[in-house]
Amino acid sequence: LRKSLLLLSSVLAGSLMLAGCSSEKDAASGDKTYTIGVTQIVEHPSLDAAYEGFKKALAENGYKEGDNVKFDVQNAQNDQSNSQSIAKKLVGDKVDLIFANSTPSALHVLNETKEIPIVFTSVTDPVGAGLVESFEKPGENITGTTDTNPDAIPQTVGFMVDEAGAETIGVIYNSGEQNSEVQVKQVNEIAKEKGAEVVEVSISTSAEVKQAAESLVGRVDAIYIPKDNTVVSALESVISVANDKDIPLFVGELDSLKRGGVAASGFNYEDLGYQTGLMAVKILNGEKKPSEINVETPESAVLTFNKAAAEEQGLEIKDEWADLVEFLE
């Protein structure tokens, strides 16, 4: 009898250990349906790609839309008051996790909750924006990925001055976007080091973008568009002016490059969204809290060149550039 009891105890202990080991791993396979709130400041290819990457990471790790996950997707259409209302709605609905796709989107949800887990992406300066204390110590309920590589702007502005011969650089941005202010400051610093001048044009809505581009005609040798949600959402207006007036247009990310920019130092936003999705998986699995996950950055930036856009905008392509850039296929 004693041997039987010992054997039974061993079996039960082993079963409990196995159950404990598998509980976190199998969190996605339970009966619970998770509601994930998605807040995005505006529609444009980079942000849309980040969201697709986020969903892909969740699906590949057992959190599938229509199965055990429901996405409540909200787009603010570049309206700050809409973004604030979306934040209130998602928090009021008590979603299980929030995916904040842009700096203002993340700020607005963080202002509304210190309890619901938040993962952000497409954020240029999370510390400067007040989203996190530091990359290593994000905060109680928030973490995510930044879309900034420290080499990106120096690479692009350096190429504009040293290789494309730009002595004056026009920059269009929304001064209401904190992420844009950070980028424009860096553009000015690099340009000054290179002996070039920067002409800034600030706008507040996408309807002002074309007029801003037209105001730079005859005043600049090239234009640089940062990762600014307002301007990027109306990028075709800038491309039209650049093509008509032979002004090389340099941009802040690869999706804008594909739309008609000459060159960009960047990475794939879908990959960045996927990276953020893996963070969400750890949180949903119960493996880690947001405060225990460091803010992450994209991999090294690569300067990529669009030959077709260069020809359209009157920029002569030099043979030696083949050693400096990757050409868009």
Language-model features and meaning:
Residues 17-20:
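C-terminal motif of bacterial Sec signal peptides marking the signal peptidase cleavage site
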Residues 22-24:
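Bacterial signal peptide processing site
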Residues 33-55, 61, 72-81, 176-178, ...:
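Extracytoplasmic "Venus flytrap"
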Residues 77-133, 228-243, 247, 252:
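Beta-alpha junction/loop-to-helix N-cap segments that form part of ligand/metal-binding clefts
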Residues 126-168, 268-288:
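Hydrophobic alpha-helical segments within soluble ligand-binding/sensing domains
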Residues 282-329:
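Hinge/cleft segment of the Venus flytrap/periplasmic-binding protein
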